[in-house]
């Protein structure tokens, strides 16, 4: 995780939004660690909204509509699922403080979810933060094949429709790169972020 890290003795929702506006985001070492630190990567993950890549197979799955997609319906359940340890994710950086802070951002209209439902079961989802014309993706989970991928497709569609200009993924992964995610140098990211912060806060 190249970049700077600095511990924070206490964070309010207002401080958290300010941090996002200048390129910082919070993490914890583990779900059980109460400490939170700020992260500012040297290379920032960005998913260009005008160069989103959707494979033919996933596009076919999306058209089949295997799940009901909901927005902002079950925020607490989504972040709790993202914080769960799984066989593929033995540890998580989402501690109780982070869950509480983002729940408050949700109440303020700055944190949002995209959710995949199979009947009355939440089977996949993601959450993130909107500010200006930027959306900062935080975490995702999947309990069914392609559920989180389908949520990402619907997120990008939503952001395009609403006029968002920046989808920040924090870091790139091989998984995100298949959708077109790229690494952006800190200085270049700062320019992109500043432009997004000049926009009025867009409705998600």
Curated annotation (Swiss-Prot):
Q: Where in the cell is it found?
A: Cytoplasm
State any single GO MF term. Answer: leucyl-tRNA--protein transferase activity
The family classification in the record reads: Belongs to the L/F-transferase family.
* One GO cellular component term: cytoplasm
Q: What is this protein called?
A: Leucyl/phenylalanyl-tRNA--protein transferase
Functional description taken from the UniProt entry: Functions in the N-end rule pathway of protein degradation where it conjugates Leu, Phe and, less efficiently, Met from aminoacyl-tRNAs to the N-termini of proteins containing an N-terminal arginine or lysine.
Q: What is its EC number?
A: 2.3.2.6
Encoding gene per record: aat
Organism equals Rhizobium leguminosarum bv. trifolii (strain WSM2304)
Q: Name one Pfam family in it.
A: Leu_Phe_trans
Top EC class of this enzyme: transferase
Q: What is its main location?
A: cytoplasm
Q: Mind listing the UniProt keywords for this protein, alphabetically?
A: Acyltransferase, Cytoplasm, Transferase
Q: Which reaction does it catalyse?
A: N-terminal L-lysyl-[protein] + L-leucyl-tRNA(Leu) = N-terminal L-leucyl-L-lysyl-[protein] + tRNA(Leu) + H(+); N-terminal L-arginyl-[protein] + L-leucyl-tRNA(Leu) = N-terminal L-leucyl-L-arginyl-[protein] + tRNA(Leu) + H(+); L-phenylalanyl-tRNA(Phe) + an N-terminal L-alpha-aminoacyl-[protein] = an N-terminal L-phenylalanyl-L-alpha-aminoacyl-[protein] + tRNA(Phe)
């Amino acid at each position: 995780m190249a970049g700077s890290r600095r511990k924070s003795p206490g964070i309010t929702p207002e401080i958290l939004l300010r941090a996002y506006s200048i390129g910082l985001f919070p993490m914890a070492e583990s779900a059980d660690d109460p400490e939170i630190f700020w992260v500012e990567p040297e290379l920032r993950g960005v998913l260009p909204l005008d160069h989103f890549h959707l494979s033919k197979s996933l596009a076919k799955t999306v058209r089949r509509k295997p799940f009901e997609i909901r927005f902002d319906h079950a925020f607490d359940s989504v972040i709790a699922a993202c914080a769960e340890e799984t066989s593929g994710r033995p540890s998580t950086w989402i501690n109780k403080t982070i869950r509480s802070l983002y729940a408050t951002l949700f109440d303020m209209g700055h944190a949002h979810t995209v959710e995949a439902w199979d009947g009355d079961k939440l089977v996949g989802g993601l959450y993130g933060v909107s500010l200006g014309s930027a959306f900062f993706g935080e975490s995702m989970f999947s309990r069914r094949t392609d559920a989180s991928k389908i949520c990402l497709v619907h997120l990008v569609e939503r952001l395009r429709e609403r006029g968002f200009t920046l989808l920040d993924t924090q870091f790139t992964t091989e998984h995100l790169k298949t959708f077109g995610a790229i690494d952006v140098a800190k200085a270049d990211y700062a320019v992109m972020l500043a432009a997004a912060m000049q926009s009025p806060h867009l409705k998600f």
